[in-house]
Swiss-Prot record:
Name of the protein described by the UniProt record: Methylglyoxal synthase
Family the entry assigns: Belongs to the methylglyoxal synthase family.
Swiss-Prot/TrEMBL keywords: Lyase
Gene Ontology terms for molecular function: methylglyoxal synthase activity
Amino acid sequence: MPKRRRIALIAHDHKKDDMIAFAQTHKAFLMRCDLLATGTTGGRLQDEVGLSVQRMLSGPWGGDLQIGAQLAEGRVDAVIFLRDPMTPQPHEPDINALVRACDVHNIPCATNLATADLVMIALGLAQPDPKEIHA
């Protein structure tokens, strides 16, 4: 039996509606995964999509860093981070640290919907684990 994928879902305020639509599109797959998300995004995913989500703090309060820590410990298989490139973020250093951690640990990190869709397809089809291919 394949292991359950562990996926982090994060969305900036102006991208939260996009995240909800994305999660609804991929709900069948996401329900077979262990999900973690920053606070507000996780709450909306639970309430509006009906997904079971481990909620971290909100991004500006350290949620991005909490996800980054789990990623560094090998407990995250992919990050879907719908960023708003048009709005400055007060916690930009935390965001950069999370994306850097994805690069350092060779974890897929989708920052737009097109890439997020491709990551979902790849995770659904991947045997073996994508991280093991380039180890």
